[in-house]
Each structure stands twice: as structure tokens, then as C-alpha cells.
A protein has these predicted regions:
Chain A
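Inter-motif core of Ras-like GTPase G domains
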Residues: 85-112, 116-127
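Canonical P-loop GTPase G-domain recognition
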Residues: 130-132, 140-219, 238-242, 248, ...
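Switch I (effector-binding) loop of TRAFAC-class P-loop GTPase G-domains
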Residues: 42-72, 84
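Glycine-rich phosphate-binding P-loop
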Residues: 22-45
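Short hydrophobic/glycine-rich mini-motifs in sensory/regulatory modules
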Residues: 337-345
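Short, flexible boundary segments at extreme N-termini or domain junctions of P-loop NTPases and their
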Residues: 1-29, 62-66, 163-166, 179, ...
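A charged amphipathic helix-loop-strand protein-protein interaction module that recurs
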Residues: 204, 237-333
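Conserved nucleotide-sensing/catalytic segment adjacent to the nucleotide-binding pocket
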Residues: 63-97
Length: 388, 318
């Protein structure tokens, strides 16, 4: 199968190429928490340590690219000083796919809102499709009621101010999130920001939905293991407590793994049983990956070898399971690495995990194959566009 | 014992009440003595005396209440705040406590915790602790003491308290011996036995370098490890880090009103199972041999369960 002229044929990619979709601008007044957010998310800075961060004096670009395929979408995060303006930014707003605007929840909102409006106005002319994500930050500082009230008020004022400026601005997409570096609300909000940038999201979600229905899982996430952000989840609503547990689980496993590793240990492990990765019978008919659009997407994969290739069989994919009680019939939290940097975390009924382990494993293999194919396409696309 | 604000109640609440470090900031000063009976390993009842550290209380422990406070002491834990400005007075009280012990409980073991080590820059911790250790040993005037550097924000807390409770377990050596037999049966590279509620390490068996849990030897083993950074050496902090990690994860689970029950992993480097061993203990089995599967390990744990229940039964002073 030959590779079609790509990506210009893809309708959802803007005509100036998809290089832009990877740029994210981090804005907000001084001390609102921009650098903290960037450091906690991508550099594993312990939240308490953000206290010692120096003020940002210059625009700084942080690259989280596909080097080693470390994230599913290559990102370029621009951390800015508080006094930045549209003109001093040093790049046109049309370059950015997303603006993350950080507002300290306890601030006097006048100044941040003016700044936000200024950027919305600046973006409207050159890039009306840009996403504005407003992080109402340091939320943990307030009690639940005050938190909600401030959150509502800020949203209201922003909307009013924008309407005052020009009714056209209503078309600009604005989303509000409550965030804090001290819990996983930041990770969740940023995950949601990312989701809008993943073209193949719908296919990945489809794979996760099939996984959930085949294994009776109430919730499954696909996590990027380095950033601990989730790339996709099934269509059931995300409950914050469950998300937090998954983040904690991932963190615990990644800290645990190096503890007992011995450098004296033998060569890398090989999976004893490597089932031939064909779709499990229950999955084929309902698979969204077999819809025509997904087929078209998947078949563009350059390495479209038979999926049961010999080389792949030797790969070992780590997995883990934590069983929780006393909920009835008991829940097992499973972890399966599906690519070197993506892990499937799922809540499963313990009965399914224990009695029908084969079924679960089949579905993991099937999901892994689906993800891998989507992933190959994404990778081709991003490398192609880098040269256009 | 220890000066007010040195961190005694914080440690107690984290180890024995499963509170996260973040909650300790809300603790008020302890008034007089707070007595707590905590069950450890089911049958071993620890009677913890958390002695409020304000001066007036200290004076009273050393004088009016002297015989009550210092009689029948198994272990004295004296906490020194690393940032204290009144070390002189702290040491003065400490010496008087030792005197009280000599008089009423001469057999008691003494542990000195140099606490809030997280406030010292990471690179300097070892040196600061070494200096403190020397100073405190000198102040103890011949009484054998064990010194630990601790912080509620890292695994050092678990290391120190594992060392402390280890001295209280009556048949520790029998337990270790059986653990070794069990490890062989599992072809395990590492087996670690934890107390269930505190997740403190009570016994270990390792196929690599011996790493006993009691305080004195740990520093020696660590010094050796530091002196010869052997490529093949395992992380010397692995046991206390495990306690810390699992405790934190248990807390995450309980926030979802779930209870952590067991864990199994097949990772690139090893296979591991963490499961209940007896009513009061958890066991962690680490196997590097890729042929051994988690199911086999779980089966072995099930088989060993009775033997270990029996061993613990023997524990009960009838
Ligand atoms: N940085 C740091 N702070 C700590 C540590 N341990 C405890 N603290 C803090 O020290 C303060 C006092 O802790 P407490 O446990 O109440 O002290 P205490 O020794 O019981 O004090 P008294 O009851 O008055 O004798 C709290 O704000 C804790 O959060 C630590 O390891 N590092
Ligand atoms: N309470 C709280 N403080 C935060 C949070 N995020 C950041 N901070 C603090 O806010 C201050 C300013 O953060 P910084 O990232 O330097 O702000 P910037 O100037 O926008 O880059 C620091 O003292 C951080 O510790 C949060 O979620 N909660
Ligand atoms: Mg206290």
C-alpha cells in the first residue's frame, strides 16, 4: 500500500500545516503559576518545590517532542513572563493551537481578565480556531464553596468583558478548568487540553470503548507514562477520584520498578506466551477501528506488516494489577504497557481479572495493535509535516 | 521524648494512624503525655507515650512524674529537631532522661532521631548527620544509642521505625530463618515481610548482600555500599522506600473508599507479588527469574500462610 499525499489531504489539518498544532502558549499575570505548571507537569518538580521558582524574565520554549516517541503529540510549550503582550511575544498568534491562560483564583481579576481579553482579540483576527484554556489556578487554597463561587464569577466576568468588546469574540473557544499543582486536577485539565490536539483521538477512544465493553471495565485510561497525562479515555465520565488513583498508581509503579532491579540480572525478558495478535472474536463486529474512516487511516501505516511478525513476539510488555477491596465484587486496577510510552490503566471487576485473564489479555493485545497502527500514522504525519 | 515541635506526634500519626505528611501541619502541641496502645503484629501491644515537649512538661517528667515516666520503659525515642536553636538545653534534658532510664529501666534501648532532615540540603545530609551522630553519641556517655536521620517527607521515617520495632519483636530470628526457607521455595531474590497496618519492615531475606533491619548494622551496610558503588548492588534504600510507596498508595485507595489488598507485577526486570501473608503481615516476593510466574508465587504464599500464622502464634506470651 502506498502512502497517499499526506497530510494536505486531511481535512482537519489547517492549511498552514500541522506544525502549528503543537505550539502551546502559557500566559498569565506574574506569580500566577505558569512556570510551576510547566515544571510540575513535565519536569516532575515536587509541588512544594515550586515555592522556590525564580520569576520568568524571558519567553522560554520547552520542547516535548517525539524524541524517543515520548509523547503522542510533539509539544512546544512557551512559558512567558507576566508582562508579555501580543506584540512582544515574538511570534504571531497564528502559530499557536492553544493558549493556556493561568489565573490565580485569589487574585483581583481585573488585570488578568484584561490581559486575556487582549489576547483573545489579538488571536481572533489571525487564528479564530485557537483554543483558549483558562486555568483557574491554586484552587486548593480555597474551601469548596468559595472555589466554585470564584470559578463561576471569573467565567462570568470574562464572558461579559468579551461581549462588551465585540460580539464576534463569542466564537472563540474558551474553556475553564480549576487547577492546582497540589493534586491531580492540573494533570486532568492539561490532559483535556491535549485531547483537542490529537487528531486520532476518536479512534483511540473507540478502541478503549471496545476494551471496556469486552472486559466489563467501568473505566480505562491510556496514559503517557512520562508525563503521566492521559491521552485518551473511554466515553464514560471521568471521576476525579478514579483519575487520581490511576495517577498515583502509575507513579507508584514507576518508582517501584527501579528499586528491585539488579544490574546483574540476565538479558531482557521475553514474554512467555505471546498470543497472536488478532482481534478477539467479541471485538471484531463492534470495533470502531473497522469503520471505513478508521480503516483508511490505519491502512496508511508504512510498517503495515502482518501484525504477528517475529520481531514483535520477542517484545516484553510489563504489566501489573492491584486488587482493591472491599467493594463488591472487588475491583482490580490493571496496568499494561501498550507502547514503550503509553500504558493502559483499567478498572476491572476482580472476577473478570481472575477468572477470565485470557480474555483480558486478548483485548490488551488487540488494543495494543490498534494503538500501534494509529501511532505509526501519527508519526509519519508529524515527520512529513516537519519537512513541509 | 523531645523538644516541642520537634515532630514526635507527626511521626506517630503517620506510622500508626496512616495519616499523610500534609496533615501533620494541623497538629497542635501535645499536652502532657498522650498514651496510645497500638497493636503491632496483632498480639504485640505497644504502649506509646507521646510526651509533650514544652518545658513545663519536661520538668515534670524529670521530677514529679519521674518514676511513672521512666519505669518499665522498653524503648526511649528521643527526637532532636535538626533546626533547633536550643541544642544545649535539648541535650541537657536528654542526659537527664538517660539518667532516669538508668535508674528505673536500665535495659531500655535508646533511639535518637535527628528529625526534619529534609530541611538540610540534600548533598549535605550525610555529613550533617555524621556530625550530629558523633555529638549525640558523646552526649550519651557510654550508653549504647542508635542514631537515625529522619524526615516525614521521605523513606527515612520508615527505616528508623523499622529499626525501632525490630528490637521489640520477640522471635525475629526464627522469623528470618523461615523467611529464608520460603524465599528458597519461591526462587525469590528478595522476600520482605511487613507489618500490616504500619507497613514497617519486620524481616527480610535477600539472595544478594545481607541487609539486616536492625539499626546498628544498617549504617554499616550502607557505608559499605557507599564506599564501593558496586554495579550489581541493589538499591540500599529499597525496603524503606517500599514501605513509603505502599503506604502512600494505600492512602490513595482509601480516598476512593477502597482498601488496598494485593499487588502483582511483571516488569521488565522482575516479577513481584505483594500479598497478605498472615492476618497481621504482608509479604513482598521479588523474583528475577523470568520463568517464575505470579500465579506460582501466589500459590507459594498461600501454602506458607499456615506456617507463618503458627510462628506468629508462638509469639504470644501466654
Ligand atoms: N520540614 C519538616 N517538618 C516536619 C517534619 N516532621 C514534623 N514536621 C512539622 O513540625 C511541626 C510540629 O510537629 P509535632 O509532631 O506536632 O511536634 P511534637 O514533637 O509532637 O511537639 P509537642 O507535642 O509540642 O512536643 C508540624 O508543623 C509538622 O508538620 C519533618 O520531617 N520535616
Ligand atoms: N497554593 C498554590 N501555590 C501555587 C500553585 N502553583 C504555583 N503556586 C505558587 O505560585 C508562585 C508563583 O509561581 P510561578 O510558577 O513562579 O509563577 P509564574 O510567574 O506565573 O511563572 C510560587 O510561589 C508557587 O509555589 C498551586 O497550585 N497552589
Ligand atoms: Mg506533639
Amino acid at each position: 500500500m502506498s502512502l497517499p499525499d499526506h497530510p494536505s489531504t486531511k481535512p482537519e489539518v489547517s492549511k498552514d500545516g500541522s506544525v502549528h498544532r503543537t505550539k502551546v502558549l502559557l500566559l498569565g499575570t506574574r506569580r500566577s503559576g505558569k512556570t510551576s505548571i510547566q515544571q510540575v507537569l513535565f519536569n516532575d518538580l515536587p509541588p512544594k518545590q515550586t515555592f522556590y521558582l525564580e520569576p520568568t524574565m524571558r519567553v522560554t520554549q520547552h520542547l516535548y517532542d517525539a524524541k524517543g516517541n515520548s509523547t503522542i503529540i510533539p509539544l512546544e510549550l512557551w512559558d512567558c513572563p507576566g508582562n508579555i503582550t501580543v506584540d512582544t511575544l515574538g511570534a504571531p498568534l497564528s502559530d499557536f493551537s492553544t493558549v493556556v491562560f493561568v489565573v490565580d483564583i485569589r487574585d483581583n481579576y481585573q488585570q488578568p481578565i484584561s490581559k486575556l481579553v487582549e489576547f483573545v482579540a489579538g488571536a481572533y483576527d489571525v487564528n479564530p480556531g485557537i483554543n483558549f484554556e483558562v486555568f483557574i489556578h491554586k484552587a486548593e487554597k480555597l474551601q469548596e464553596d468559595d472555589k466554585i463561587e470564584n470559578f463561576r464569577q471569573i467565567q462570568e466576568r470574562v464572558t461579559e468583558r468579551l461581549a462588551d468588546e465585540s460580539p464576534e469574540y463569542e466564537q472563540v473557544a474558551l474553556n475553564f478548568h480549576l487547577t492546582s499543582v497540589y493534586d491531580h486536577s492540573l494533570q486532568e485539565a492539561f490532559s483535556r487540553v491535549l485531547h483537542k490536539l490529537i487528531d486520532s483521538l476518536e479512534f483511540i477512544e473507540g478502541l478503549l470503548n471496545v476494551f471496556c465493553s469486552n472486559t466489563s471495565s467501568p473505566k480505562a485510561f491510556l496514559f503517557d507514562t512520562t508525563s503521566k497525562l492521559y491521552v485518551a479515555t473511554d466515553s464514560s465520565p471521568v471521576d476525579q477520584a478514579t483519575h487520581t488513583l490511576c495517577c498515583d498508581y502509575l507513579r507508584m509503579l514507576s518508582s517501584f520498578a527501579p528499586l528491585y532491579k539488579s544490574n546483574a540480572a540476565s538479558e531482557p525478558r521475553v514474554h512467555a506466551l505471546s498470543p497472536t495478535p488478532t482481534p478477539p472474536p467479541t471485538a471484531t463486529s463492534s470495533s470502531p477501528a473497522s469503520t471505513s474512516s478508521a480503516r483508511a487511516l490505519l491502512s496508511q501505516s508504512p510498517s503495515d506488516e502482518p501484525s504477528s511478525g517475529v520481531a514483535k513476539k520477542s517484545l516484553f510488555y510489563p504489566s501489573a494489577a492491584a486488587s482493591l477491596s472491599p467493594s463488591h465484587p472487588g475491583t482490580t486496577l490493571t496496568y499494561h504497557l501498550v507502547t514503550p510510552h503509553l500504558a493502559l490503566l483499567a478498572l476491572l471487576p476482580t472476577t473478570v481479572y481472575e477468572m477470565r485473564k485470557g480474555l483480558v489479555e486478548w483485548n490488551v493485545v488487540w488494543l495494543r495493535e490498534g494503538i500501534r497502527e494509529i501511532w505509526e500514522v501519527e508519526k509519519t504525519r508529524s515527520t512529513t509535516t516537519h519537512f513541509t | 521524648m523531645g523538644a516541642s515541635g520537634s515532630g514526635k506526634t507527626s511521626m506517630r500519626s503517620m506510622i500508626f494512624s496512616n495519616n499523610p505528611a500534609s496533615l501533620t501541619e494541623r497538629l497542635g502541641a501535645t499536652i502532657d503525655v498522650e498514651q496510645n496502645h497500638v497493636r503491632f503484629l496483632g498480639d504485640l501491644i505497644l504502649n506509646l507515650w507521646d510526651c509533650g515537649g514544652q518545658e513545663a512538661f519536661m520538668e515534670s517528667y524529670l521530677h514529679q512524674q519521674r518514676s511513672t515516666v521512666f519505669s518499665a520503659v522498653g524503648v526511649l525515642i528521643y527526637v532532636f529537631d535538626i533546626e533547633t536553636r536550643e541544642l544545649g538545653r535539648d541535650l541537657e534534658y536528654f542526659r537527664e532522661c538517660l539518667e532516669g532510664l538508668r535508674q528505673y529501666s536500665p535495659a531500655a534501648s535508646v533511639f535518637l532521631l535527628v528529625h526534619k532532615m529534609d530541611l538540610v540540603r540534600e548533598g549535605e545530609r550525610a555529613a550533617v548527620l555524621a556530625r550530629k551522630r558523633e555529638e549525640l553519641e558523646r552526649a550519651s556517655g557510654g550508653k549504647g544509642v542508635t542514631v537515625f536521620g529522619t524526615s516525614i517527607y521521605d523513606e527515612t521515617l520508615y527505616k528508623a521505625w523499622s529499626g525501632i520495632v525490630h528490637t521489640l519483636i520477640p522471635n525475629a530470628s526464627t522469623l528470618s530463618r523461615h523467611l529464608r526457607i520460603f524465599a528458597d521455595a519461591c526462587s525469590a531474590n528478595e522476600v520482605v515481610l511487613f507489618e500490616r497496618t504500619t507497613f514497617l519492615v519486620i524481616a527480610t531475606s535477600s539472595s544478594s548482600a545481607p541487609a539486616p533491619v536492625d539499626g546498628g548494622d544498617i549504617s554499616a551496610a550502607e557505608a559499605a555500599a557507599a564506599a564501593a558503588p558496586d554495579e550489581t548492588a541493589l538499591n540500599p534504600k529499597r525496603y524503606e522506600r517500599t514501605s513509603e510507596l505502599i503506604k502512600a498508595f494505600k492512602q490513595s485507595c482509601s480516598r476512593l473508599r477502597e482498601e488496598f489488598h494485593s499487588l502483582e507485577m511483571e516488569l521488565a526486570e522482575f516479577t513481584a507479588v505483594l500479598d497478605e501473608m498472615t492476618k497481621n503481615t504482608y509479604v513482598l516476593v521479588i523474583v528475577h527469574n523470568p520463568v517464575v510466574e505470579t500465579a506460582a508465587i501466589k500459590m507459594n504464599i498461600r501454602i506458607a500462610r499456615r506456617k507463618f500464622e503458627e510462628l506468629q502464634g508462638d509469639n504470644t506470651p501466654s
